[in-house]
Amino acid sequence: MNHTSDTALLIVNLGTPEAPTAAAVRRYLGEFLSDRRVVSIPPLFWKPLLHMVILPIRGPRSASKYAKVWLQEGSPLSVYTRRIAEGLTQHLPDWRVAWAMRYGAPALTKALDALQAQQVRRIVILPLYPQYSTTTTASVQDVVEAWCKRTPQVQVECIQDYAEDSAWVAAVAASIRRHWQAHGRSEKLMFSFHGLPQRVANNGDPYPQRCQVSASLIAAALDLNESEWVLGYQSRFGAERWLQPYAEPTLWALAESGIRRFDLVCPGFSVDCLETLEEVALGFSETLAARGATMRYIPCLNDDPAHVQALAGLAQRALL
């Protein structure tokens, strides 16, 4: 059946500032941190704190970090997400393929409107978050559900997650093997995932379990025993307790125990971005070097052909 005119895949990533400037970062963070899925503090208290304290401080500070990793084509997250969409058109020639961001541009609602204007009747939404969380995937679903209420004639399927999808697991494992073949193997492999307030997990968010499943499956695909890998959580924000173990202090403790060479991969990130390139590849490496250890960062899958093929398979199965 030819789906050219009526079926589409819309991949959705988190979002990014449009430029590595304080003003652009403030706009982006203002939208991101105003999502009640991300920050659940009552708006009456949160909005003044956000706009009067947090954004004026974090805007310039984060802009300088973005500048370190910005590509000639733009933000790494945006560049790689677009390339994935372009690659998907090769695997899904009878589909329309589009991409959007939950925060910033291209806006999710505008992308949905554009597909409807092209007479699309079925849309598969694929949030590029391998592990489901109420703070990420559910936020995308909120926007999609609101859009569907005013556009009931379009059939929409939203993929929940792909934490244990065999093709995705194989793609991550293959990328690690290629790294080892090119650079040799270190003493310990860390799987570092974006953190989450412990409070959110206590309220039933399955994210930590999904991360554990992904890490265990990738480790099994690499024939690693439990002593050869470790899981950690990064990117903590604020003062409250987040999921543990925290990635960077865990690396420090392992270095102090005598381990000197680490490899680190971030399977919770579909593409490289500020958190992987600046926080991990640059930041973690620097603090470990100060402790006499080395860390090599293994890039995200980005537009790796095996990654693109795995995502295409997810989209096709969503309509079965």
Curated annotation (Swiss-Prot):
Binding site for Fe cation: H194, E275
InterPro entries referenced in this protein's UniProt entry, alphabetically: Ferrochelatase (IPR001015), Ferrochelatase_AS (IPR019772), Ferrochelatase_C (IPR033644), Ferrochelatase_N (IPR033659)
GO terms for biological process, alphabetical: heme biosynthetic process
Keywords associated with the record: Cytoplasm, Heme biosynthesis, Iron, Lyase, Metal-binding, Porphyrin biosynthesis
Enzyme class: lyase
Cleaved signal peptide residues: none
Pathway annotation: Porphyrin-containing compound metabolism; protoheme biosynthesis; protoheme from protoporphyrin-IX: step 1/1
Main localization, broad class: cytoplasm
Family: Belongs to the ferrochelatase family.
UniProt name for this protein: Ferrochelatase
Protein source organism: Xylella fastidiosa (strain 9a5c)
Protein's gene: hemH
